[in-house]
Amino acid sequence: MSLLDHKFGQGGIVVSQLEDVLNWARLSSLFPMSFGLACCAIEMMQTFTSGYDLDRFGVIPRPSPRQSDVMIVAGTVTFKMADRIRRLYEQMPEPRYVISMGSCSNCGGPYWEHGYHVVKGVDRIVPVDIYVPGCPPRPEALIGGFLKLQEKIRKETLVAPKAVERFLETHAKEKNIA
């Protein structure tokens, strides 16, 4: 007799929270959209080859932002590209996550001091969830970033406190109108 049979009897019922089930589904099916801008993109492409087999983690690359829930920004972000990155981020469905890969996208890299054309970190454009350090980071580092993102998703709650506040404010406004 297994532990579950002993605990729940013969009914075959497993008790869980909805948050746990949704988070498990989210972390088990990450669909990244790659946004490669420089030499970090080569390492990112290598990470998606069969040698590293990201499918076993549930990570399957998608070509469109509308099908993705993770954006990987890899490389030097210039001011000309900033608007495009923001637009692609806004096209992604919620919940959406961003991985910043490499020194250039994290903080401007070697161009941070004298490069007038370089954004000093992609976090000035879009909110970043995971930073992967390195110049360029190895594929193992990006895999580690995906694992950290999965841990972050596992700990998420179904409703964020700000969303609750926004709902209550909207509900109060609707009450005043009616």
Swiss-Prot record:
The UniProt family comment states: Belongs to the complex I 20 kDa subunit family.
Q: Which residues bind [4Fe-4S] cluster?
A: C39, C40, C104, C135
Name any cofactors this protein relies on.
Answer: [4Fe-4S] cluster
Which NCBIfam families does the entry link to? Answer: nuoB_fam, PRK06411.1, PRK14813.1
Please state what the protein is called.
NADH-quinone oxidoreductase subunit B 1
Going by the UniProt record, its keywords in alphabetical order are: 4Fe-4S, Cell inner membrane, Cell membrane, Iron, Iron-sulfur, Membrane, Metal-binding, NAD, Quinone, Translocase, Transport
The record describes its membrane topology as: Peripheral membrane protein
Location(s), subcellular: Cell inner membrane
- Catalyses which reaction? a quinone + NADH + 5 H(+)(in) = a quinol + NAD(+) + 4 H(+)(out)
Describe, as the record does, how this protein assembles with itself and its partners: NDH-1 is composed of 14 different subunits. Subunits NuoB, C, D, E, F, and G constitute the peripheral sector of the complex.
Q: Which organism is it from?
A: Cytophaga hutchinsonii (strain ATCC 33406 / DSM 1761 / CIP 103989 / NBRC 15051 / NCIMB 9469 / D465)
